[in-house]
Amino acid sequence: MTFLIAAAGTGGHVYPGLAVGEALVDSGVRKDEVLFVGGDRLEATVYPEAGFPFLQTVLRGLSRSPSLETLTLPAVIWKARSTILEEIRRRGTRVALGLGGYVTVPTGMSCSRAGIPLMLAEQNAGAGLANRVASRWAQRTFVSFPNTMGLGTGEWVGNPVRKPLASFDRETLRAEAHARYSLDSSFPVLAVFGGSLGAGAINEAVASMAQSWAGSTFQIVHLTGRRHIDDLADLEASDHLTWRRIGFEDRMDLFYAAADLVVARSGGGVAELTATGSPSILIPGDFGSSGHQEANAAFLETSGAALVLSQADVGSLGSVVGDTLFDSSSLMKMREAALAISRPRAADTIASAMREAIS
C-alpha cells in the first residue's frame, strides 16, 4: 500500500502536509510508502530533507483573472496530471490527500482517473481556489475552522501541526527557549513571525518600534524570514529593549515557548498559535485566497484568542503591544481561549482516515 500527499507552495501548505506524513509513519507506515507531490518551491527541499520520496512536477498557480498565462494553464495542469497519474499507477497508490495550492487540482484529476479516494484538507476559514476546484473529486474534506466557507460540509478536525507543537508544553521548554535566544526571564517576550517567507510590512513596523521604544523593558524574538534578515541586521534597538533577529528557525516549539505574546500573519499557521496556547496580535495579509487571512483572524478574535490589527493600521503596533504585553490577566485569558479552540491532533486524525480508506 502507498499513500500520496500533495502539498506545495508556502509553509502554510507544506508543513501541514509534512505533519500528516509524519503521523502516518508514527502509525506504522514506512516512509518510502508516503509519496509527496509538489513543484519547485519550499516543498522541493522540505520533503526530501525529511526523508520522504518526492515527485516534482512543473506547475504554477491558478490565476483569478484573465491573462496570457491563463491560456496555457490547461496544458500545464494536464501535463502535471499525466505525471502524477503515471506515478500513482507505478507505485500502486491507494489513497491521496490534497492540502490546497496549485498541485491539488492535477492530483484530484489523477485520483479520479485512477479510481482511488481523494481527501482534502483546508487550512483556512475560506477555502482556496485549488481546493474548491478539487472538491468535485473528493470523498472526504477536513477543515481547520468550524464554519469554513467554500467547501460545503467539511469535518472540523483542525489544521495539522507537527508533533513538537501537537504535544507542546510551554513550562517544560521555557528555560531552553530562553537560553536559545539569550533572554532574561525577568522581562516579557514579544515573538514576531511573518510566515515562511517573512513579512516586509510587519518587519518594518517592528523595526520602527524597536528603535524608538521608550516604555517598559521587554524583549523581542523576531523571525524575519531569510530574505529580510540582512535588511534588519545592522539596526540598533532602543536602550529599553532587547531585539533578537533570526532569519529561519527549525525549532518553532522553542520560538513559541519563549513568547508571552506573538505578532503574526493569520494564514493557516494560526493553528500553531492555538496548539501552543499563544496569545497573539494578528495582522492579516492582503494576498492569497480572497479574504482568507481576515476570516482566520476574525475567528481567533471572536474566540478571545487574539487581537486583530489591519495592515493599514500596522503603524500603531507599538501602542497595541504596550497595552497587551504587560497585562498578565489579559494574556492568560487569551492563552486559555486559544487552547479551547485548538485541535492539535489533526494530523493523527487525517492519517487515521487515510489508513481506514484502504483497510
Label each PLM-derived region with a short phrase.
Residues 3-8, 30-76, 157, 228, ...:
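Conserved nucleotide-sugar phosphate-binding/catalytic loop shared by glycosyltransferases and other
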Residues 93-95, 249, 257-270, 278-279:
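Acidic donor-binding loop of glycosyltransferase active sites
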Residues 41-46, 173-179, 183-261, 294-297, ...:
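Donor-nucleotide binding loops and adjacent catalytic segments primarily
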Residues 303, 308-309, 313-329:
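C-terminal "capping" alpha-helix adjacent to the active site of nucleotide-linked donor transferases
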Residues 343-359:
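C-terminal alpha-helical cap of glycosyltransferases
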Residues 330-344:
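A short, well-ordered alpha-helix in the C-terminal region of glycosyltransferases
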Residues 35, 112-175:
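Active-site-proximal region of nucleotide-activated glycan assembly enzymes
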Residues 66-95:
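An amphipathic, basic-hydrophobic alpha-helix
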